Design a protein with these regions (language model features):
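Acidic, Ser/Thr-rich peripheral helices and adjacent loops at domain boundaries
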Residues: 14-18, 80-83, 100-107, 111, ...
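C-terminal structured domains
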Residues: 9-15, 149, 161-243
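A broad structural signal for short, well-ordered beta-strand segments within beta-sheet-rich domains
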Residues: 25-26, 52-54, 77-79, 139, ...
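ATP/pyrophosphate-binding catalytic subdomain of soluble kinases
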Residues: 112-179
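Short amphipathic alpha-helical segments and helix-helix/interface helices
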Residues: 45-46, 71-72, 164
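An N-terminal, globular interaction/scaffold subdomain
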Residues: 1-67
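Gly/Ser/Thr-rich loops at beta-strand to alpha-helix junctions
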Residues: 37-38, 62-65, 88-90, 149-150, ...
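Contiguous mid-protein beta-loop-alpha structural module that forms a pocket-lining wall or clamp
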Residues: 52-133
Length: 243
């Protein structure tokens, strides 16, 4: 482990006022370690945990593949691991996430998948119409354009990768060609446009207009505004965490 070999901690109370005079309070214990001292973190955390309470580990940033044994020791008492795969820099991070789910009792949860929920809802709503549902198995191409705001091209591509995998799972087809485009911008990995190509040349384009705060779908050359809006509020990672 890199960094200065030191360890420090502090405790603070956080209170949230509810209706009336009631409030919900919690204690937050922060431990910061560097260098060789990080080895002391797992036993310290275990000693501070309240028995029979659910435990979640929120890992901020990229997963340290070179320290798998250490991370899995830290996850030993955890029920859930929360990550944001937009910070991942290589495919091995996703493979390791799968291995954690397979060989430990900790269930991984990816905020990047949660951020994709609105796009999945929009797409599913589009195929609610019987005429579109009949075309579901005729999908041949997916062209996905996303915004890249990090140094990791792989991390910026994961939301698009998740969307493509989800679409392929819905169709049950392995004959869909996928193309990902990354454009520079501030909204890390956020999908901006999806082009769905069908056999026979039919095409559907789903796009979000951040300036207008709308999502449109162009089906067979006709454009409509969708009621279900995909990420126009710009939900950040902080918005997805319940404290």
């Amino acid at each position: 482990m890199k960094g200065t070999s030191e360890i420090s901690s502090w405790i603070s109370a956080n209170c949230h006022r509810l209706s009336g005079d009631k409030q919900v309070c919690s204690e937050e214990i922060a431990i910061i370690a560097g260098g060789s001292r990080v080895r002391h973190i797992p036993p310290l955390v275990s000693a501070l945990l309240i028995p029979d309470m659910p435990v979640a580990v929120w890992w901020v940033g990229d997963l340290p593949n070179e320290e798998q044994a250490y991370v899995e020791t830290l996850l030993d008492p955890a029920d859930r691991l929360i990550v944001d795969s937009s910070h991942f820099d290589r495919v091995e991070d996703l493979i390791w996430l799968h291995q954690i789910a397979e060989r430990t009792f900790t269930a991984p949860a990816d905020l990047n998948w949660v951020k994709l929920e609105d796009w999945r809802l929009v797409t599913a709503a589009l195929f609610d119409a019987p005429s579109m549902r009949e075309r579901l198995h005729d999908i041949r191409t997916l062209n996905i354009t996303a915004i890249g705001g990090t140094q990791s091209l792989f991390g910026d591509s994961i939301e698009s990768l998740y969307y493509a995998a989800w679409m392929i799972a819905q169709t049950g087809s392995d004959e869909i060609d996928n193309t990902f485009f990354i454009e520079p911008g501030d909204d890390t990995g956020a999908i901006m446009q999806v082009k769905i190509g069908f056999s026979g040349g039919f095409e559907v384009v789903i796009a979000r207009d951040v300036a207008k705060g709308i999502v449109t779908a162009t089906v067979g050359g006709k454009t409509q505004t969708l009621d279900c809006v995909a990420r126009i509020l710009g939900r950040s990672t902080e918005d997805l965490i319940v404290r």
